[in-house]
Curated annotation (Swiss-Prot):
SUPFAM superfamilies linked to this entry: Ribosomal protein S2
Organism: Drimys granadensis
InterPro entries given in the database record: Ribosomal_uS2, Ribosomal_uS2_bac/mit/plastid, Ribosomal_uS2_CS, Ribosomal_uS2_flav_dom_sf
GO molecular function: structural constituent of ribosome
Oxidoreductase keyword on record: no
The protein's name: Small ribosomal subunit protein uS2c
Cellular component terms (Gene Ontology): chloroplast; mitochondrial small ribosomal subunit
Highest taxon, organism lineage: Eukaryota
Keywords (A to Z) from UniProt: Chloroplast, Plastid, Ribonucleoprotein, Ribosomal protein
High-level lineage: Eukaryota, Viridiplantae, Streptophyta, Embryophyta, Tracheophyta
Family of this protein: Belongs to the universal ribosomal protein uS2 family.
């Protein structure tokens, strides 16, 4: 994997609050190598180490995108949801930002069936077929469509399992992470001071609660993906 320069700026990360961890009582001892200090009862992440792993993650996604690989971004808590959707749309990635439905990856055949149903209902709605049904039937199908849009809207174009999954909050998205581990899908995780850095292929020590921190990390990663995609298109 070729190392590239991603303009990862320590001052910019400090301004976004990337270095602020959780309260010292909530920490995971496995995070000790990534913590530089305690301040007013919270752990402070070592941003030099963060920058190193952040750069490695950018190299990985660039390399994967330049080979035409597919990405899934997962972040369902309120503070992450909007940033996940906008970052994923910018880089033409799949995303889950409302709720990870158990078995979404490990029971892919069921997910695929739901996606087919979703696409069929969307097509019927677009063609005006739902409005020609009895009111009760139309209302039921519209509710079903709304439910599918909420939970599957970000993966509606997926035709198979992703090649790499980017996870915003390891604790919040543990079910998704566990499914990736089961299937051997490589993961990149933002890990706060209460997380286990050994569970992801690349762990980026960072504040996973601040919107500015989440947005900064995701924007850099999707910029690397976009550059990789451009390289893939040029070399086809």
């Amino acid at each position: 994997m070729t190392k590239r320069y991603w303009n990862i700026n320590l001052e910019e990360m400090m301004e976004a609050g990337v270095h602020f961890g959780h309260g010292t009582r909530k920490w995971n001892p496995r995070m000790a190598p990534y913590i530089s200090a305690k301040r007013k009862g919270i752990h402070i992440t070592n941003l030099t180490r963060t920058a190193r792993f952040f750069s490695e993650a950018c190299d990985l996604v660039f390399d994967a995108a330049s080979r035409g690989k597919h990405f899934l971004i997962v972040g369902t808590k309120n503070k992450a949801a909007d940033s996940v959707a906008s970052a994923a749309i910018k880089a033409r990635c799949h995303y889950v930002n409302k709720k990870w439905l158990g078995g979404m990856s490990t029971n892919w055949s069921t997910t695929e069936t739901r996606l087919h149903k979703f696409r069929d209902l969307k097509a019927e709605q677009k063609a005006g077929k739902l409005n020609r049904l009895p009111k009760r039937d139309a209302a039921m199908l519209k509710r079903q469509l709304s439910h599918l849009q909420t939970y599957l809207g970000g993966i509606k174009y997926m035709t198979g399992l992703p090649d790499i999954v980017i996870i915003v909050d390891q604790q919040e998205e543990y079910t998704a992470l566990r499914e990736c581990l089961t299937l051997g899908i490589p993961t990149i995780c933002l890990i706060d001071t209460n997380c286990n850095p050994d569970l992801a292929d690349i762990s980026i020590p960072a504040n996973d609660d601040a919107i500015a921190s989440i947005r900064l990390i995701l924007n850099k990663l999707v910029s690397a993906i976009c550059e990789g995609r451009s390289s893939y298109i040029r070399n086809r």
